[in-house]
Amino acid sequence: MLPSTARDGLYRLSTYLEELEAGELKKFKLFLGIAEDLSQDKIPWGRMEKAGPLEMAQLMVAHMGTREAWLLALSTFQRIHRKDLWERGQGEDLVRVTPNNGLCLFESQSACPLDVSPNAPRKDLQTTYKDYVRRKFQLMEDRNARLGECVNLSNRYTRLLLVKEHSNPIWTQQKFVDVEWERSRTRRHQTSPIQMETLFEPDEERPEPPHTVVLQGAAGMGKSMLAHKVMLDWADGRLFQGRFDYVFYISCRELNRSHTQCSVQDLISSCWPERGISLEDLMQAPDRLLFIIDGFDKLHPSFHDAQGPWCLCWEEKQPTEVLLGSLIRRLLLPQVSLLITTRPCALEKLHGLLEHPRHVEILGFSEEARKEYFYRYFHNTGQASRVLSFLMDYEPLFTMCFVPMVSWVVCTCLKQQLESGELLRQTPRTTTAVYMFYLLSLMQPKPGTPTFKVPANQRGLVSLAAEGLWNQKILFDEQDLGKHGLDGADVSTFLNVNIFQKGIKCEKFYSFIHLSFQEFFAAMYCALNGREAVRRALAEYGFSERNFLALTVHFLFGLLNEEMRCYLERNLGWSISPQVKEEVLAWIQNKAGSEGSTLQHGSLELLSCLYEVQEEDFIQQALSHFQVVVVRSISTKMEHMVCSFCARYCRSTEVLHLHGSAYSTGMEDDPPEPSGVQTQSTYLQERNMLPDVYSAYLSAAVCTNSNLIELALYRNALGSQGVRLLCQGLRHASCKLQNLRLKRCQISGSACQDLAAAVIANRNLIRLDLSDNSIGVPGLELLCEGLQHPRCRLQMIQLRKCLLEAAAGRSLASVLSNNSYLVELDLTGNPLEDSGLKLLCQGLRHPVCRLRTLWLKICHLGQASCEDLASTLKMNQSLLELDLGLNDLGDSGVLLLCEGLSHPDCKLQTLRLGICRLGSVACVGIASVLQVNTCLQELDLSFNDLGDRGLQLLGEGLRHQTCRLQKLWLDNCGLTSKACEDLSSILGISQTLHELYLTNNALGDTGVCLLCKRLRHPGCKLRVLWLFGMDLNKKTHRRMAALRVTKPYLDIGC
């Protein structure tokens, strides 16, 4: 017989278990079955499965003793969200655990709590803490809250793609907002990959390790899970072992509900496994501490309005917003390191508090990581393979799964289908549909439940979500619920269908299982409440990814879909007014009117919203107001899909630009490799090609939009198959495209056959840019078959950095000999060498050739090429512009070239010889050209060591009455103040020289003042003088300012 104390404990424990409902008792048993506390004394599931409350109490006491059974029961009560039983149990005589009254900082929905007995054997401080962190974070509750689904974090976690940025995104955006970067996403052109292990390591830009790392990610990107994984890996000895002695996790979500003052000591104590610990030892080395501040964007708005006096002492008690603000501003414990996670909407506020943080962005799952996640989620390999095969056949949804939250939702829904024995059904195409799919799947009849389960007081649910969103509030108490007609019973019912989740640490607080679900319901509120709610949401949003309403507005557009509207009405009884669509269309029309029919600022955000609608008429009407559409820094395959999908409906658009970012296909910005070389990066390029449907959409756009005359695709990984599909549209009779740019689009030589057919069939196409593609000589030969065809009307072709070698000269010469329409040819960055140039010149000298502009920059040309070019200039009277920059021509080469330039039949107007290793000797020949050539108007000699002597020689030509030069570049030519005497003389005589560029020359104050004196003369015709890069005193600057007043049309740059 048991002792009386044990009998009392057994009886009391059974009364607690009797208070559990049937579902809760089953959950209790399942958690008990996976509890590591039991070690070898786990109770066999066969004995627990049918046991009632009394039998369960007897089994627990028999297996582990009365007190241990109580401690484990209390821990399990927390896990099944019975905080009332846990709190009451603390008063039992057999349980002597002092409750922790400090701040609760561990997020309730993500970590399975494990209490540490105060009587546990005393260990080293760090070892004790690591044990606790390991137990705290090694298990996580699945958000779907199915009975017993507490999974191992390490088994579920899948590595995310992280990139670091090389400059502050806010500064970057401000600097370039008026130039070409209209969206914060464009900062990605200056990113590079980074691993979690090196977040706090120095790099080429930071010789010292960063003290603050900001980890940014959109909704559902896995910020909190990554933060939890950092905690677990540190505790397991896999991360930051030589860097941080202690890592503490602070949940901003939980901080919001704290209204008491606390100190850093209280903050750390609340993270510690037991109370009363002295933190003096920890504070001896604050540089060895890391604070993870998770969810900065979830902080209540009052935090951002917090004012000093700030907290300066770690023992000083202050309101939480002051304490955290002091920590982030580095006024408190400036030596500690911080890892802060946030959504984009809070970045500007956060960066206003920080100095030189390392900025890292989560881009989600790569394609391989998505596959890995599915196998981790489904323990059954067969199920995982089946689901993966299904999703691979439905590419848009698989692409959307780059967002971890979407991957989880999709896996949860498909797992439910598999477990119910159903065939995998057609799945949704948009984010809105994915969330609706999940919501309705939760309300499907479960075993033993006969009917579809609709949550009570649906209107109250969506109004609660909306009010929380407007006030940026994510935790709700019973008073909040009552305000919207909800009570505990309503919420408990909804918990059963897994939309709400009750906080583990605080009985009175409720929250949606993920912020994105709150945003989904808030969108429903706007759709159901008509014009005013929609107008307010759109006005505050403004199509900015940094706005806290971004995802809500995306969902709002998705709910406008007619099929979605009918679905809501049929299953939930919700009716969306047609006025909502009218309001949205009117708002877009106003946006077009205010931006001059150009969609650039917020373009990707708007297209993403329209993609959610999935209705041709609506999208076409919305985009009919834009003649120019420019989308920059498209960073994922899904974003590419969104853009191409909407491009089909841009029926009024004349110019369409789609620019991918450096990581839009998961590849670095490397130069192209020689064709035929199958390296690892070549394999990666093939693996990361955009799906065929992307090119098919664009093909449809070019053949259905008769207004479209310019299509620019930059960093769009089309590949050969993508080009083949696009060319189908280009060959269509209704295609009116004139300008096609396919720069850095992973095009190989094999695709040139399709391009050749397109330039033959499409007589409207006059400009083609294939720069930065691995075309090679074989590809060029295929392309040239089309370029020299009699039907080809191409006038300009750019082939920069296309791996064209000497043999390419023969094919190009053949084109020039047959195509009289081609007037511009850009071969920059191709190693043609002298032999290739010799072949090219055969075509240039052909009587059919009408080429006017030729770029030969960085083509590995030398002196021999100058001789061939000289003979060409004597015969070709159509060539007006020649760029030979960055070729090792030398003085001797230019002197040979001048023989052709001096010929009476030479009509060249623009010559660029920058960085050609020229000295003063070359100026002799150039001066002689200026004395006889009346056609030459622009001359660039920048970055050549001409010196003052060179300018003196050049001046003889510039002062000659025959010289008609209008623009002269002499940047970085080694000129001094002595050269200004010759320059002044030239400006006093020349009546045609209008622009003079002298940047980065040491003219000095004396020389510049001499020039100013000449410029004041009314006979001086100069209109542009650039003097940047010179150390001039204030007096000289005042003289130039006075000169601008005298001649307001004069552009003086300094």
Swiss-Prot record:
Its main location: cytoplasm. Disruption phenotype: NLRP12-deficient mice exhibit attenuated inflammatory responses due to significantly reduced capacity of dendritic cells to migrate to draining lymph nodes. They also gained significantly more weight and a greater percentage of body fat than wild-type mice. NLRP12-deficient mice also exhibit enhanced disease in a mouse model of multiple sclerosis. During viral infection, augments host response with greater type I interferon production and RIGI protein. Gene3D superfamilies: Death Domain, Fas, P-loop containing nucleotide triphosphate hydrolases, Ribonuclease Inhibitor. GO terms for cellular component: cytoplasm. The keyword Magnesium does not apply. ATP binds at residues 217-224. Residues 129-201 form the FISNA domain. Keywords: ATP-binding, Cytoplasm, Leucine-rich repeat, Nucleotide-binding, Repeat. LRR repeats lie at residues 821-841, 850-871, 878-899, 907-928, 935-955, 964-985, 992-1013, 1021-1042. GO terms for biological process: cellular response to cytokine stimulus; dendritic cell migration; ERK1 and ERK2 cascade; negative regulation of canonical NF-kappaB signal transduction; negative regulation of ERK1 and ERK2 cascade; negative regulation of inflammatory response; negative regulation of interleukin-1 production; negative regulation of interleukin-6 production. Plays an essential role as an potent mitigator of inflammation. Primarily expressed in dendritic cells and macrophages, inhibits both canonical and non-canonical NF-kappa-B and ERK activation pathways. Functions as a negative regulator of NOD2 by targeting it to degradation via the proteasome pathway. In turn, promotes bacterial tolerance. Also inhibits the RIGI-mediated immune signaling against RNA viruses by reducing the E3 ubiquitin ligase TRIM25-mediated 'Lys-63'-linked RIGI activation but enhancing the E3 ubiquitin ligase RNF125-mediated 'Lys-48'-linked RIGI degradation. Belongs to the NLRP family. This is NACHT, LRR and PYD domains-containing protein 12. The gene is Nlrp12.
